A protein has these predicted regions:
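Extreme N-terminal segment that seeds HTH/winged-HTH DNA-binding domains in transcriptional regulators
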Residues: 3-51
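NAD(P)-binding Rossmann-fold cofactor-contacting core
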Residues: 128-148
Length: 233
């Protein structure tokens, strides 16, 4: 890249091409948990036709400090240019790459009850690159049914399905009594990550398998605490 062209790229709010995203360094989970929020706000800015934004303007929208934004993004090399700010489209795409959204991830759901079917009905997952390919259950009355054209299969079919389909993520929406054994089975079948909605903290033998536990009642308890706190002011 010539120096003149590099300056032109920078003038548009892009980084020089030598600035590559490096994920080898350890990034705190607190930073990782904030990245989807940046991605969401940047998507809204694109919908509004905003082409560039300063860290101060972004901080006002997100109700966080500008220094927090700069520190978070600097973990990945930084994306802004002094006097210009951030190119919204570029930053949106780069955060998408950081979060792995430039690759399709196939998901299966274990448990086709109310929660499992609600997840299968959430179409926005597909827009983010997450495609639910099947649900599994032990209830024979659900066999052969579909949720948004996604088939419900019997749990006994899980082994064969995973061996013939390239599944990345399994969502567990089943009773906690069976969750541990099913989780280990999924790991043995090559699942890379488990999205755990069962009311149990899972442990599996393979430490490279990512487990993200979602306890829905935890959020309600936090709301309850804040209601009590506010009532005491």
């Amino acid at each position: 890249m010539t120096e003149a062209f590099q300056k032109f790229i920078i003038s548009l709010g892009f980084l020089p091409l030598k600035e590559e995203i490096v994920l080898s360094k350890e990034i705190s989970q607190a930073v990782i948990r904030r990245m989807p929020r940046y991605y969401r706000y940047l998507g809204e800015l694109l919908d509004e036709g905003v082409e560039r934004i300063s860290s101060n303007d972004l901080s006002r929208r997100m109700k966080v400090t500008a220094s927090q934004i700069r520190q978070d993004l600097n973990n990945f090399g930084g994306f802004g240019q002094q006097g210009y700010g951030y190119n919204v489209q570029f930053l949106y795409e780069e955060i998408g790459k950081i979060m792995g959204l430039n690759t399709e991830h196939k998901i299966i759901i274990i448990g086709a009850g109310n929660l499992g079917q609600a997840l299968a009905n959430y179409v926005k997952f597909e827009k983010l690159g997450f495609r639910i390919t099947a649900l599994f259950d032990v209830n024979p009355q659900l066999k052969g049914k579909t949720v948004r054209d996604i088939p419900i299969l019997m749990l006994s079919e899980l082994d064969d399905y995973c061996k013939t389909h390239d599944v990345d993520i399994a969502a567990l929406t089943m009773p906690k009594s069976k969750a541990d054994s099913i989780a280990q089975k999924l790991v043995d079948l090559g699942i890379k990550a488990i999205w755990n909605f069962a009311h149990v903290d899972l442990e599996v033998a393979d430490k490279d398998v990512v487990i993200e536990s979602v306890h829905l009642s935890d959020s309600l308890m936090q709301l309850s605490y804040n209601i009590v706190k506010n009532s005491q002011k």
